[in-house]
């Protein structure tokens, strides 16, 4: 696990951009993408660059259940706004939040991941150590699945909605086994509220109670964190 500590999220975005550029320069064709406030500075750096993804495929981590793709709170809408409108990919895959048969949608998305092995997957980390929507206690061997979101995750996402009651209670998510199949993982974390999760992920035991700790077992992980998120690490990086 390569750990890079930067001053703030803006600097983290520049480091994240370097990881994307290096992957593209080395022939990466499939990029696993994430949403939320964490990757936006990396996406901004990409948008303002001359990187070309027109021959590449994107596969997103997750999507809320019950939200239409054109809803401004959907992850499809987020990706269009923050990346795809400026940097289109040859093809882009996200779970279908309005799928009438969730079980069939899970199988479809597993097939997408199998047919498009991910070269670089970007991740954030929740305050409880979740990655994607894989909450504490999620089985390590799980692939795409429907998740009942925890109260802490609903609360954390409420800032994006008119009220906490509007936050969806379920989501489709790549599983931990799906994520671990990626060739290279890039995890970003910014802010003091991520410090406990970051410490557990890097220095704590590998435990299902902190899903991100599974990354200790992956052969190629880059972690980009700001000084606040790194504040509880006992070792200097």
UniProtKB/Swiss-Prot annotation:
It is an enzyme of class 3 (hydrolase). GO terms for biological process: carbohydrate metabolic process; glucosamine catabolic process; N-acetylglucosamine catabolic process; N-acetylneuraminate catabolic process. One of its GO terms (cellular component) is cytoplasm. Transmembrane segments: none annotated. One of its GO terms (molecular function) is identical protein binding. PROSITE patterns: GLC_GALNAC_ISOMERASE. It holds the Pfam family Glucosamine_iso. The keyword Hydrolase applies. Pathway: Amino-sugar metabolism; N-acetylneuraminate degradation; D-fructose 6-phosphate from N-acetylneuraminate: step 5/5. Its EC number is 3.5.99.6. PANTHER family: GLUCOSAMINE-6-PHOSPHATE ISOMERASE. Belongs to the glucosamine/galactosamine-6-phosphate isomerase family. NagB subfamily. This is Glucosamine-6-phosphate deaminase. It comes from Lactiplantibacillus plantarum (strain ATCC BAA-793 / NCIMB 8826 / WCFS1). The gene is nagB.
